[in-house]
Amino acid sequence: MFSIQQPLLVFSDLDGTLLDSHSYDWQPAAPWLTRLREANVPVILCSSKTSAEMLYLQKTLGLQGLPLIAENGAVIQLAEQWQEIDGFPRIISGISHGEISLVLNTLREKEHFKFTTFDDVDDATIAEWTGLSRSQAALTQLHEASVTLIWRDSDERMAQFTARLNELGLQFMQGARFWHVLDASAGKDQAANWIIATYQQLSGKRPTTLGLGDGPNDAPLLEVMDYAVIVKGLNREGVHLHDEDPARVWRTQREGPEGWREGLDHFFSAR
């Protein structure tokens, strides 16, 4: 049992979870965002998006100043009041976007894997793929420690590609719509654990944690949460956790922000 009155952190994925996968609407979640803000409960966004995209969304959602996890955990944007922490305002895990791009270009040229990265196209194309405005699409290209791509080869070649990346110290991660390449040392779980430890160090008490996500790349995050909401999503693979004790994990019947609201209702409204 837990409540929003105790030390609590909420970690949330964006697309398909807090945001509608198609319209990017978040209004069904607005009442809970307001309630959490009024209770001084940090809502920490955690996504494959770039920090530039997420800072814009943070402001839109009324969450500015809080930490966030970008690029599937490869980037941690620190809270505004954490200026004394080394690396402020952002901590980068592993090798840079530019270095990963060089590896991918070499694999494509020498081993003929077929894929299209966000670096290969302009913001108009990304806007068409995603439904974002061109100005928002431009923010998706500001990667610091990962590469986003569309896979255009066979499943067999994907297995070979994944193995080659692993040999080179990289990982290949599936998101709700796209695939992501990042350093093997990075992850949403590691980033979340770092943020949890920082809050614990500052307050003297470990906060209870609740995570919400809808895609396979959210599983590592949800595994390290005390409580988890698996929002019904579009991805055919779904989300599968090692510990799916119903006292800890709730699978929603609704999608997107309505599922987000359903998950919060489940864990808090009856308590």
From Swiss-Prot:
<keyword id="KW-0378">Hydrolase</keyword>
<feature type="binding site">
    <location>
        <position position="214"/>
    </location>
    <ligand>
        <name>Mg(2+)</name>
    </ligand>
</feature>
<keyword id="KW-0460">Magnesium</keyword>
<dbReference type="GO" id="GO:0016791">
    <property type="term" value="F:phosphatase activity"/>
</dbReference>
<dbReference type="InterPro" id="IPR006381">
    <property type="entry name" value="HAD-SF-IIB-MPGP"/>
</dbReference>
<dbReference type="InterPro" id="IPR023214">
    <property type="entry name" value="HAD_sf"/>
</dbReference>
<dbReference type="InterPro" id="IPR006379">
    <property type="entry name" value="HAD-SF_hydro_IIB"/>
</dbReference>
<dbReference type="GO" id="GO:0051479">
    <property type="term" value="P:mannosylglycerate biosynthetic process"/>
</dbReference>
<dbReference type="GO" id="GO:0050531">
    <property type="term" value="F:mannosyl-3-phosphoglycerate phosphatase activity"/>
</dbReference>
<feature type="active site" description="Nucleophile">
    <location>
        <position position="13"/>
    </location>
</feature>
<keyword id="KW-0479">Metal-binding</keyword>
<dbReference type="InterPro" id="IPR012815">
    <property type="entry name" value="MPG_Pase"/>
</dbReference>
<protein>
    <recommendedName>
        <fullName>Mannosyl-3-phosphoglycerate phosphatase</fullName>
        <ecNumber>3.1.3.70</ecNumber>
    </recommendedName>
</protein>
<feature type="binding site">
    <location>
        <position position="13"/>
    </location>
    <ligand>
        <name>Mg(2+)</name>
    </ligand>
</feature>
<dbReference type="InterPro" id="IPR036412">
    <property type="entry name" value="HAD-like_sf"/>
</dbReference>
<dbReference type="GO" id="GO:0005829">
    <property type="term" value="C:cytosol"/>
</dbReference>
<comment type="similarity">
    <text>Belongs to the HAD-like hydrolase superfamily. MPGP family.</text>
</comment>
<dbReference type="GO" id="GO:0000287">
    <property type="term" value="F:magnesium ion binding"/>
</dbReference>
<keyword id="KW-0963">Cytoplasm</keyword>
<dbReference type="Pfam" id="PF08282">
    <property type="entry name" value="Hydrolase_3"/>
</dbReference>
<feature type="binding site">
    <location>
        <position position="15"/>
    </location>
    <ligand>
        <name>Mg(2+)</name>
    </ligand>
</feature>
